[in-house]
């Protein structure tokens, strides 16, 4: 009972959630107090995005869980956590259906353990080489990629994807991920020579799917494909939820192992946003013969929910290709492709390719220089970049009320074209397009520097400037931007989709740009959970790009403000970036890496 009291006190101090204590008492309330504590800490860490709880976090050392010290008197000094956990009916090695699984020195929730093994098996064992006519493939690639004296990593990535069942292509902004996939799909169709080749395109969010549709469409129009060949590439991408057949009001999906997807090739963009459970469900729904090509940026923020799947996969990218694979890729591309050393995680390494040249950001781009410096964790270089005369980046302080008002004025100017089109009652598609040109990004949800506070202040400020006209008894007004916060497959709206409230003669409706390019309007009363989105979190901005992005960092240090968060925000900007940040907060963020504890990288190398 003493431990239960300690756990409840931890809830009061917001060190645990009520859910964590409820889980611990339900599955291990009658067990040794140490097992109950481990269950609570495991549940807590899962809520923080971690896949497992290493036993080192339960031992009295510098890596121990912060709550451990306060509970030592209740559980006693344990000499062997592994022995204690396995003596419990709530824990097994995975050979019994227990709530918790101990695998090596890592403790898992049962479902997370199952998900992790599904993903590890897929990339380790299911992944295999595909036999190709190397002479024909080399000839096809030469026609699609210009001849170059230096190594063309886009061409290498295409060769990787065309010779493996599963491939992962990672690259920063402007490295040509979409161009690469357009060309490799063109090569695939040309080499299929009329054989069945059902291709599907998908991304985690509606915004990312719409961007993939637009950018891939542009890239494909530049390629030498016949009209018949072009028909074989889908005109639009869908969200992963839509692809898998999410059911209204249900967690069940239409497509799973018993009813797999009807496709031969699947391209998935923005793979860094895919959490471990979603990746597992996607893998379960794939037919045995399907090829899968994952695109993403390994340096971006990890998924909101548990895991950092793309990061764990790409942990082996720097190890390079095996010697045999490097020789094959050299033959296919006509240039020397360097080999790495060793054979660890060979199957996975031979399926990865990093795009290493940015075609968007040259040496004259402040955004590109800043993103690279942040990615290296080089605080001095970040400071130097801002001291140079780059015209596409600017840094502002937010130390006073005057600074805050100046930031609101700049936001008003940023949304200027949108507000002008709104006043001119332009067509909904033009208004939506204009809104997406500028975006305020926040690290936090609450407080004056968070999404909630900032959205309220912007609305008040715009009302004062007579740019919008809010009614006292309604949240709805002409031009209110909203973001969907919960999937509604019946309406075809998903988490992250953005709509604009407009009255076009039928009363106020909310207008959305759909992935297929069409515009759809919905009555406000029919919308699923949603929120105003003049400002959005950096997490929500993933999969989107804006001509001008403005990042606002809080005035105090907080664990969520990390290098990956700042890098992700900076790389949302296409042409201009505004950064509102205190020097100390920015430096601390760049020095702080996001940590997601999982066993996936270990499973790739050891095949446990």
From Swiss-Prot:
InterPro entries linked: AAA+_ATPase (IPR003593), Coronavir_polyprotein_1ab (IPR050534), P-loop_NTPase (IPR027417), RecD (IPR006344), RecD_N (IPR049550), RecD_N_sf (IPR041851), UvrD-like_helicase_C (IPR027785)
DNA-binding region positions on the chain: 247
Subunit structure: Heterotrimer of RecB, RecC and RecD. All subunits contribute to DNA-binding. (Microbial infection) Lambda virus GamS protein interacts with the enzyme without displacing any of the subunits.
Similarity field: Belongs to the RecD family.
Activity regulation behaviour: In isolated subunit ATPase and 5'-3' helicase activity are inhibited by non-hydrolyzable ATP analogs and EDTA. After reacting with DNA bearing a Chi site the holoenzyme is disassembled and loses exonuclease activity, DNA unwinding and Chi-directed DNA cleavage; RecB remains complexed with ssDNA, which may prevent holoenzyme reassembly. High levels of Mg(2+) (13 mM MgCl(2+)) or incubation with DNase allow holoenzyme reassembly, suggesting it is DNA bound to RecB that prevents reassembly.
Catalytic reaction list: Couples ATP hydrolysis with the unwinding of duplex DNA at the replication fork by translocating in the 5'-3' direction. This creates two antiparallel DNA single strands (ssDNA). The leading ssDNA polymer is the template for DNA polymerase III holoenzyme which synthesizes a continuous strand; ATP + H2O = ADP + phosphate + H(+)
Protein origin, superkingdom: Bacteria
Gene Ontology molecular functions: 5'-3' DNA helicase activity; ATP binding; ATP hydrolysis activity; DNA binding; exodeoxyribonuclease V activity; helicase activity; single-stranded DNA helicase activity
Miscellaneous comment: In the RecBCD complex, RecB has a slow 3'-5' helicase, an exonuclease activity and loads RecA onto ssDNA, RecD has a fast 5'-3' helicase activity while RecC stimulates the ATPase and processivity of the RecB helicase and contributes to recognition of the Chi site.
Free-text disruption phenotype from the record: Loss of RecBCD enzyme exonuclease activity, no effect on recombination proficiency or resistance to DNA-damaging agents. Cells can be transformed with retron Ec48-containing plasmids.
Annotated residues for binding of ATP: 171-178
Protein encoded by which gene: recD
Originating organism: Escherichia coli (strain K12)
E.C. code: 5.6.2.3
GO biological process annotation, one example: recombinational repair
Free-text note regarding domains: The holoenzyme may undergo conformational shifts upon DNA binding: the nuclease domain of RecB may swing away from the DNA exit tunnel in RecC. When Chi DNA binds to the RecC tunnel the nuclease domain may then swing back to its original position (that seen in crystal structures), allowing it to nick the DNA 3' of the Chi site and then rotate to load RecA. At high Mg(2+) the nuclease domain may swing back more frequently, explaining differences seen in assays performed at high Mg(2+).
Protein's UniProt name: RecBCD enzyme subunit RecD
Function statement: A helicase/nuclease that prepares dsDNA breaks (DSB) for recombinational DNA repair. Binds to DSBs and unwinds DNA via a rapid (>1 kb/second) and highly processive (>30 kb) ATP-dependent bidirectional helicase. Unwinds dsDNA until it encounters a Chi (crossover hotspot instigator, 5'-GCTGGTGG-3') sequence from the 3' direction. Cuts ssDNA a few nucleotides 3' to Chi site, by nicking one strand or switching the strand degraded (depending on the reaction conditions). The properties and activities of the enzyme are changed at Chi.
One GO cellular component, as annotated: exodeoxyribonuclease V complex
Entry keyword set: ATP-binding, DNA damage, DNA repair, DNA-binding, Exonuclease, Helicase, Hydrolase, Isomerase, Nuclease, Nucleotide-binding
